[in-house]
Design a protein with these regions (language model features):
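Short internal beta-strands
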Residues: 26-31
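Phosphate-bearing ligand-interacting subdomains
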Residues: 33-84
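A short linear-motif detector with a strong N-terminal bias
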Residues: 4-8, 24-25, 38-40, 64
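Short, solvent-exposed amphipathic alpha-helical segments in soluble enzyme
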Residues: 18-24, 75-78
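Flexible, charged surface loops at secondary-structure boundaries
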Residues: 1, 20-21, 51-56
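Functionally constrained cores in energy, signaling, and assembly domains
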Residues: 15-16, 23, 58, 63
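Glycine-rich adenosine-cofactor-binding loop
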Residues: 1-19
Length: 84
């Protein structure tokens, strides 16, 4: 399963050990522009706008601002069923 992780902060760092090994992280997205074009765990971090056009199964929200992130993704045209 190909996933996108939205959020690269403390919640991701605490939860990454629980990601199942069959999950392939395609890319990280984050609203912090200082993190864009850097890497976390060997995976590139990009702007949320860059997720459009990528092939993935789900976007997993890993932030205390999950509700706001979900609204942001809806505004980008991401369907609700793709967001966890």
């Amino acid at each position: 399963m190909r996933i996108v992780i939205f959020g690269t902060g403390q919640i991701y760092c605490q939860q990454r050990k629980y990601l199942e090994p069959d999950k392939e992280i395609v890319v990280f997205i984050d609203n912090d522009s200082a993190k864009w074009n850097t890497y976390l765990d060997g995976v590139k971090i990009v702007s949320p706008k860059d997720v459009c056009g990528l092939e993935y199964d789900y976007i997993i929200l890993m932030s205390m601002y999950a509700h706001e992130m979900k609204l942001q993704l809806y505004a980008l045209g991401i369907p609700q069923e793709k967001i966890i």
